[in-house]
Amino acid sequence: MALTLDDHLEAVANVYRREMLLALTDHNPQFDRAALTYGSNQPLEDRQVALEMEHVHLPKLVDMGLIRWNRGEHEVKKGPEFEKIEPLLAVLPGRRNSLVDDQSP
């Protein structure tokens, strides 16, 4: 599947997907957030994020070919299409929490 600019923008539009992709630029592989926050003793918000990662965000990035995800090992690696999104990620390092909330001039 050839990814379009819209696909790349959709991939980084969510903070959790963006954080995972940015983390992979620094360290490949990563452990998925779901594995780290899935325990019942975690705050509800963390468990909700874990569920979103497992059922929405990581599968979306897999479908795009941007990551490879080994659910059993809770390991995320760069996918076959990852190099195509790297130029976009390169302009985001100072904006890991938001693309539009930065109020600096």
Where are these regions (language model features)?
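Short, Lys/Arg-rich nucleic-acid/phosphate-binding segment
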Residues: 71-76, 82
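Short alpha-helical segments that sit at the start of domains
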Residues: 1-27, 32
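A short, conserved structural fragment
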Residues: 58, 62-72
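Short acidic, hydrophobic short linear motifs in intrinsically disordered regions
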Residues: 30-46
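Residues in the recognition helix of alpha-helical DNA-binding motifs
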Residues: 57, 79
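Short, amphipathic alpha-helical interaction segments positioned at domain boundaries
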Residues: 83-105
